[in-house]
C-alpha cells in the first residue's frame, strides 16, 4: 500500500473551503491507512507552510521529489494539468480530486493546451468527485472517463457547527453573509435591505475569520445570505444551516443536492429583487411568528447526517481499497 499525498496550494493562508476539505481528507486517511503508510499534505509553493486559520492534525511532505514505488498523489482539479505533467515524468500514479466541476478547464497561461488538460484526466487512475453536480459535470466534459469517477463524501464538523435549544434561544436579530463572492450583487442587496429592515435587525459581514470565529457568528445569526458562484459544494451554506440559520440565496449549482425547504430558499443568480423580497418576507415572518426551534431541528439533524464524519470515513475507506490496486 502506497502513502497518499495530497498536493495543495497555500491560497495565501486565507479561509478556503477546498483547502479545508483536503486537510480533512488527509487527517482522516492518516487514521484509516494500514501501518507503514501515511497520508500527507504537500504544499508545493512552500514546503514549510501550513494553514493556521483552522485546527488540524496532519502530516506534511517536506521534500519535492516523489517516490513512484511508495507514493500515490492526488491533485485538485484547478492545478491538475501542471502537476500531472510532472508526475507523469516521474512515473508517479495519481488521481484528480475535482472540488469544483467548473474548474476542470483551468490551466496555466503559458505552455499548456486544452489537449494537456485532456491528457491529465486520461492518465489519471481515477477522478474523485464530492458532489452530484461535480459528477455530472465530469461526465458531460469527459463522458469517456465516467468509469473513472469515484464518489467521496465530505463532512462538516458537528462539534463546531451545531445548534442546541440554548443556542437557538439566544440568537440575535442578525443576518450574515460572506462578501467574497458576487460582491456587486451583495452591495446592491444590502442597500435595499437596509432601507426596509426593522431597526432591531442588523447585517454582518463574515470575512477573513478563523473557523471557530465563523461558527460562533453563525450561532448568533438567524438568516444567512448565500452569494455562491459556480461551485462544487460550497461549505458556508451548510455550516450556517447547521448553526440554525435560514439560508436564502444562490445555490452555486452544487448546493442543489441539499437546498431543501424549510431551511434553504433558492434565488436564481442575479435576481436581486426576488432575493430582497424573500429576505424581507422572512424577517417579517420571524417578527410576527417568532423563531421556533422545533421547526428547524429535524431538518438540521438530517443535514448533519448527510455530511457526517462517519459517511466521509466510509467513502475514504473505499478510496483506500481503490489505491491498493495501484
Model-based region annotation:
Residues 246-249:
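Short hydrophobic beta-strand element within catalytic cores of glycosyltransferases
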Residues 270-277, 287-325:
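A charged, aromatic-enriched C-terminal amphipathic alpha-helix characteristic of glycosyltransferases
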Residues 46-123:
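Extended catalytic core of nucleotide-activated donor transferases of GT-like folds
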Residues 1-72, 235, 253-255, 267-269, ...:
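N-terminal pre-catalytic "stem/leader" segment of glycosyltransferase-like enzymes
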Residues 82-84, 124-146, 188:
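A short, active-site helix/loop in glycosyltransferases that binds the activated sugar's phosphate group
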Residues 229:
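Aromatic "clamp/platform" in nucleotide-sugar-dependent glycosyltransferases that forms part
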Residues 18-21, 134-141, 151-212:
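Conserved catalytic-core segment of nucleotide-activated headgroup transferases in glycan assembly
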